[in-house]
C-alpha cells in the first residue's frame, strides 16, 4: 500500500491509542451482526443471535483481539503487506474458505469502530489513510485466492 510519510505518521500515531482487546471484539461483533452470513465461519463461538450476545461473547472478543494483533503486525510492514499476511491468506483461502470480500467488510468495520472510539482524533485525513491501509490488508489477505 502506498502511503505518504504524513499518512504513515497518522496511522502509526493513532494506532498507539487503539486498544486491540476492546476494538477488535467490537469490530468483529459488528461484522457478525451487520453481515450475519459471516457467522457461518464461527460455528464454535456459541450464541451469536443478537447484538448484545455478539458484543458480550468472549470468543468474539478473543478472536477480534487476535485479528487486531495481526493487523498491528501488518502496520510494521506497510511496504510488504502481501508477505506479512501470506500465511494468513493461505489459511483463510485453503483451509477456512473465507470469502475474501469479508476482509473488506471487516476493514470497514474497523475504521468505523476506530472513528467511534477515537472521536476528534480520527480526522478525515486519518480516515483516508486508514481506508488505504485496510484496503491494502484486504488485498494482501485475498492474495492466495485463485
UniProtKB/Swiss-Prot annotation:
GO biological process, one term: hydrogen peroxide catabolic process
Record keywords: Acetylation, Heme, Iron, Metal-binding, Oxygen transport, Phosphoprotein, S-nitrosylation, Transport
Keyword Cell division: no
Residues involved in heme b binding: 63, 92
Modified residues (S-nitrosocysteine): 93
InterPro entries found in the cross-reference section: Globin, Globin-like_sf, Globin/Proto, Hemoglobin_b, Hemoglobin_oxygen_transport
Modified residues (Phosphoserine): 44
Domain Globin: from-to ranges: 2-146
N-acetylvaline modified-residue sites: 1
Residues modified as Phosphothreonine: 12
Keyword Heme: yes
Cellular component GO terms held in the UniProt record: blood microparticle; haptoglobin-hemoglobin complex; hemoglobin complex
Tissues expressed in: Red blood cells.
Positions where N6-acetyllysine occurs in the chain: 59, 82, 144
GO molecular-function terms, A-Z: haptoglobin binding; heme binding; hemoglobin alpha binding; metal ion binding; organic acid binding; oxygen binding; oxygen carrier activity; peroxidase activity
Matches recorded under Pfam families: Globin
Domain of life: Eukaryota
Function statement: Involved in oxygen transport from the lung to the various peripheral tissues.
Family from the record: Belongs to the globin family.
Record PANTHER family: HEMOGLOBIN FAMILY MEMBER, HEMOGLOBIN SUBUNIT BETA
Subunit structure as annotated in this protein's UniProt entry: Heterotetramer of two alpha chains and two beta chains.
UniProt protein name: Hemoglobin subunit beta
UniProt organism field: Peromyscus crinitus (Canyon mouse)
Taxonomic lineage of the native organism: Eukaryota, Metazoa, Chordata, Craniata, Vertebrata
Amino acid at each position: 500500500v502506498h502511503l505518504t510519510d504524513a499518512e504513515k505518521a497518522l496511522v502509526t500515531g493513532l494506532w498507539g491509542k487503539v486498544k486491540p482487546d476492546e476494538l477488535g471484539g467490537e469490530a468483529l461483533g459488528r461484522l457478525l451482526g451487520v453481515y450475519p452470513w459471516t457467522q457461518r465461519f464461527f460455528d464454535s463461538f456459541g450464541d451469536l443471535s443478537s447484538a448484545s450476545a455478539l458484543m458480550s461473547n468472549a470468543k468474539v472478543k478473543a478472536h477480534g483481539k487476535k485479528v487486531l494483533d495481526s493487523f498491528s503486525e501488518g502496520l510494521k510492514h506497510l511496504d510488504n503487506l502481501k508477505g506479512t499476511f501470506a500465511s494468513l491468506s493461505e489459511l483463510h483461502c485453503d483451509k477456512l474458505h473465507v470469502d475474501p470480500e469479508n476482509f473488506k467488510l471487516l476493514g470497514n468495520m474497523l475504521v468505523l469502530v476506530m472513528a467511534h472510539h477515537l472521536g476528534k482524533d480520527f480526522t478525515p485525513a486519518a480516515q483516508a489513510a486508514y481506508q488505504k491501509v485496510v484496503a491494502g490488508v484486504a488485498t494482501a489477505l485475498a492474495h492466495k485466492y485463485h
